[in-house]
From Swiss-Prot:
The lineage of its organism: Bacteria, Pseudomonadati, Pseudomonadota, Alphaproteobacteria, Acetobacterales. It comes from Acetobacter pasteurianus (Acetobacter turbidans). The keyword Protease does not apply. It comes from the Bacteria. Keywords: DNA-binding, Methyltransferase, Restriction system, S-adenosyl-L-methionine, Transferase. Residues 282-305 are annotated as: Disordered. This is Type II methyltransferase M.ApaLI. PROSITE patterns: SAM_MT_C5. Residues 282-297 have a biased composition (Basic and acidic residues).
Amino acid sequence: MNKDEVVVSLFAGAGGFSSGFSQAGLKPLFGAEINADACQTYQENVGSPCHQLDLSTVDPSHIEMLTGGKRPFVVIGGPPCQGFSTAGPRNFADPRNLLIFNYLNIVERLSPRWLIFENVEGLLTSGGGRDLARLVREFVDMGYSVRLQKVNLAAYGVPQTRKRVLIIGNRLGIDFQFPEELYSFDSGKAKKASGKPLAPSLAEAVAGLGPAASDKDALVPYASSEPVNAFDARMRAGNRVEVVTHHVRVEAAERMQVELLKPGQTMKDLPPELWHESYRRRANRRVSDGTPTEKRGGAPSGIKRLHGNLQSLTITGPAAREFIHPTEHRPLTIRECARIQTFPDKYRWVGNNASVIQQIGNAVPPLAAERLAKHLRDIDGSFGADTRPAGAMSAKLLGFVLTEALGMSPALKSTEALLAEMHQGGFVF
């Protein structure tokens, strides 16, 4: 990496975003992450320091010091953003706002050439759309020309339908587009037939792994000496020991229910008398504090059997308990979840099983991150230089895509109206 191409990873987690950037030749100078296990996992794999920091309170000047005073090419990562749309300008009185406002202060202090912000789909409608609109307004006021898009990462080759909100911005005053989508996808729930080849299926993602072990410390050999498909080859690359960890069979608590489920079915497809008690309790639970979540506060579906010939549903922390293998009566193993998230088999995980699956579920898939990193290199005409091209425009919201569906919910329409107003030069807090 050129000495001028500084990458900083905030909210770095276990290093998924950073690993993908490293694969594209843009290894971060450092990561910053509050969780000790995730920070150590990052260091074990990314090959650059991870500073265990509380980004809600750290002084932005400290982050600037860690860069050696160099202006970054890009800052990657994103904090939770709930509840800050009604706060005053960078007002830290509400503790929920500490992370997002200090994140913005850090970005402003570092003044990177590019930024990539990633968050869950629920951010689209958080605070009636004003949380997202406020965030975009902050970036524009800092001098960034930004595009916002809800992206399904399966379109970039990830073997799961993982919807994420991405904001990409630059200080060059240039327009740009998101990376071209390379794949169609179908998880049985989310689907897009674009005429392009299907993204790798769940079965393709876990192919080549040997039978799951019962011993929690087992080193499990591959099912064959050679990779069985292109995705398996990518996952095996660099794993010199020819065995994998975290490929351990765990019996489902709801064994009888699991055996009755067909691919694509969930607990709610079973007769109510077979519902597990924990599912009954959770079915009545809602998120009450406005925090954007995977399911936007909706009721969970409990266990679900996945389709082997389709892409997986979104891998999150509970996946190793709730996602049932397509053909075996057991949940997915942690290793299978890691592969579906495109973490290679050589990746070394730090922490107990609960910590590891949470790290995996929280991560940006390295394969998607690599695609984004390569795209930045392609669209940045004078890569790494601190110059503005001739004809540069003023900072603005360049465009946004909230959904590809034909209809919109009332909540999403509210967000669209706010962003449309901003796109036309309005919307001031």
